[in-house]
Amino acid sequence: MRPEKSFQGLILTLQRYWADYGCIILQPYDMEVGAGTFHPATTLRALGPKRWNAAYVQPSRRPKDGRYGENPNRLQHYYQFQVILKPSPEDIQDLYLKSLAAIGVDAALHDIRFVEDDWESPTLGAWGLGWECWCDGMEVSQFTYFQQVAGVECAPVAGELTYGLERLAMYVQGVDNVYDLNFNGRDGAEKVTYGDVFLQAEQEYSRHNFEHADTAMLFEQFKMAEGACKKYLDAGWASDKKDKHLMALPAYDQCIKASHVFNLLDARGVISVTERQSYILRVRELAKACGEAWIHTEAGGVRG
């Protein structure tokens, strides 16, 4: 299945490429997240001393970006391909360029540029030195050297690659409208487009996100997720010495829920500018507490 002929072929090619490199190929996290970085395979596994190489597709939701299916390249639900390499290899840029070649983008034939763009996620309490990757004037990927995640310094530094799958697919297929992407690589009556799969969902979720999401319920859900996260964090310490944590992952799930609910409230326009900063801070405090708990788990590097 040729990557330049189908959306799913592009995904399969990236999975094979990074599997051959030595990454474990994970599945998407089964929660509503705003970006692939929120997957615990990146946010939490970037912390601690243990080696970690993983790649996965992650459906991502940004409610405010919906356009009722009327914009050719703006979506409230889209896909990222995420690669996390810890410690970051010295040849990460070369590895990335070879991955582009694997999906049909030859650096010798195209203008590939790396534009400095340091990355920050306020809600995750994370930042890193980064570059946008431009191909013939269009941003197609981002790579970042994580310096801090969840308020915890990254040692060793992890390298993260994020591919915008729809944008890359539009580029290699040569289409101007995301809904025209060939999804399955077939022609004629057997051809399935991106629009066949997702256009109705974009229309319906735009109505939901902007017009009908129950704001009273969402405010309550935020408080419940915030409270549950704090409860699990408190309950997870194995002893009063707080030297080992036993429930970092369930707590982090609640942090993810709080973040998505905040994004829905933001899309509904019921949060003021001042309140918005307060909500971001509240989610960040949860994320930082989860990161602190994680580095006291076995996978986070604690002994015993």
Swiss-Prot record:
Its main location: cytoplasm. The keyword Aminoacyl-tRNA synthetase applies. Keywords: Aminoacyl-tRNA synthetase, ATP-binding, Cytoplasm, Ligase, Nucleotide-binding, Protein biosynthesis. GO terms for molecular function: ATP binding; glycine-tRNA ligase activity. Pfam families: tRNA-synt_2e. One of its GO terms (biological process) is glycyl-tRNA aminoacylation. InterPro entries: aa-tRNA-synth_II/BPL/LPL, Gly-tRNA-synth_heterodimer, Gly-tRNA_ligase_asu. It is found in: Cytoplasm. SUPFAM superfamilies: Class II aaRS and biotin synthetases (SSF55681). It catalyses: tRNA(Gly) + glycine + ATP = glycyl-tRNA(Gly) + AMP + diphosphate. GO terms for cellular component: cytosol. Its EC number is 6.1.1.14. The keyword Transmembrane does not apply. PROSITE patterns: AA_TRNA_LIGASE_II_GLYAB. It comes from the Bacteria. Belongs to the class-II aminoacyl-tRNA synthetase family. Tetramer of two alpha and two beta subunits. PANTHER family: GLYCINE--TRNA LIGASE, CHLOROPLASTIC_MITOCHONDRIAL 2 (PTHR30075:SF2), GLYCYL-TRNA SYNTHETASE (PTHR30075). This is Glycine--tRNA ligase alpha subunit.
